[in-house]
Amino acid sequence: MHDNLCLCLHCIRSDRDPEPKAHRELFLPPGELEALFASLRDEGYRFALPGESEAGDGPVCCVTFDDGYCNTRHFLETAEKFGIPFILFLNSYNVAHQVPFIWDIWEATRREPWPVSSVSYRRLYESLTPDEKTLLATDTHRPFAPEELEAFAAHPLVHLAPHGHTHQPLVGRYLEKAGIELDENLTFLERYERVLREDFSLPCGLYTRRLTRSLLARFKRIYTIDGGGFSPKDRVIHRISLVHPDYGGPLREQIRNSFGVKSRLMRKAQNLRYSNRLLSRLSLFGTAP
């Protein structure tokens, strides 16, 4: 077991932001994060990017964000306080088209569970009504505006990296579209500095052996959300996805639990469920993650 940690965060909600209308569990309080990083620092962890984790002594904690919510900018104060370089794995479609994330729109407007991997994200975006596109256009749910992202990406602690253009999980029938998703995403990122073009975060954390082989032929590191630690030489980095303490318990406890056999097995079962074409269709009648 490796002591190095790679954390996956999605949203940060300041007291000034409106209440979330979807996926409340993803919104982390800044104060809880500051307490977590102070605790990790006191335990001897140093903060670094995964690609720089071999340098220096002691265990490493790496911090990543997925998707591109504009509220990611709230993390800069914490990052500066603790000297934390971090990665934002960005979905470019939402910034380019200025539309909130489809899974939030779905949860806010429909009763059916979010289908995760059995639908075309691009087609869903194209089918949105004007009202659906603006329903969640608040500082809580919206993506970065282009000018905001440009300013954010210029910060020396910020590094952008690809996460797919529309966030389409690259499994089942959508594996054949992987090249298009990646090319559009990387082309969009060319305009920014400090882009980690050799790092890729799997949309929804879903993967198969075939996809893994294909991605490792193109990227140096790919990132899951399977939990546990990592070694600096790992090319598949299993991140720990943190949720609001009201849903998952204290953040430090969530990290410890991610190393447990039960947690890892549950994540593998979930990955199998949504990566398999037949099972992903059946998942429409279950509970989406």
Q: Language-model features: where?
A:
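Metal-dependent polysaccharide deacetylase catalytic core of the NodB/CE4 family, i.e.
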Residues: 4-16, 23, 80-206
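A structural preference for long, well-packed, hydrophobic secondary-structure segments
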Residues: 32, 51-53, 57-62, 69-76, ...
